[in-house]
Every structure is written in C-alpha cells, then in structure tokens.
C-alpha cells in the first residue's frame, strides 16, 4: 500500500464582501500574495505529496505563471477551474485528486484549505493529519469569542448558544 496525501487549495473566491478590485487570495502581505503563504506551507510539509489548486477560470494562467512557477511550488500538480459555489470547487478538486492518483496510491488523506487563509502552519497540518487518521475526518477550528445569536425567521434574536460549544471553522 502506498499513501499519498493531497492538499486541495481553494482560491476561486471573488471576495465580494471585501468590495476590492483584487481578489483577497491575490492581495499582497509583505510582498507576497496571500495565496503564497498557504501554498508554501503545503509545499514544505513532508505530510503532503501533491497540491491541487482550484481557482477561477480567469485566474488559471496568473496562478500558474505568477504564483506556482514564480515561487517554485513543485508539488502543485494541477491548477483547475472552480465552480460557482465553494462546494462546487471542492467537488472539482476531489475529482482532480481521483484523476491524478497513481495506481499504487491506495490510501491517503485529502486536506481542503481556503487559500485566502494564510495562517495555516505545519503544526495545524500535523494535528489535523493525526485526528483524520484517528477519526477519519477532521476540521481546523478556533473557539468563538464573539456572542452569537440564533434568530427566528423575522430576524429577531431567539437564543444565545453557549460560547464554549461554538467553533469557527478555518
């Protein structure tokens, strides 16, 4: 049996809530696009053998030339178009993983990561990897600090969930 762990990095979002002309995954932080930091973490991780980058159709060439090639992300095996919604892009990434697997790869874990979240680390990958092996699934999350309200169909607050029971998925 051969294990092959793949990271699907989602970078097809339009960032409409930001009202920016530049998609947030391409905004620069300290001279590098936000997407660079996520790809670098997966590139440098010994846990990951393959990266599938899912982006908008209009950004494929940019991602290939200005990010993957420019920064030497050799583990990126495919840059593919995403779908209309996030779940469509995840599905496209999963299909690409299946299509890209060598015959000898019979096991492995698929990491799905939002490319606009640059703070992923080797520690997070290792903990998710261990939990995925143990429980067959894992999601990185942080405890919520804000007060959250559950509203009725008219928008009126009905209940307040306990903060210690609410997590923000990363």
Residue ranges of model-derived segments:
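N-terminal glycine-rich phosphate-binding loop and ensuing alpha1 helix
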Residues: 2-61
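Short aromatic-hydrophobic micro-motifs that form the base-stacking/packing surface
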Residues: 109-113
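Short active-site oxyanion
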Residues: 48-52, 77, 136
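Residue-level signal for inorganic ion chemistry
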Residues: 9, 35, 93, 114, ...
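Conserved core of the sugar-phosphate nucleotidyltransferase
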Residues: 106, 119-170
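Acidic metal-phosphate-binding loop of nucleotide-sugar-dependent transferases
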Residues: 16, 115-119
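Short phosphate-binding loop-to-helix
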Residues: 69-107
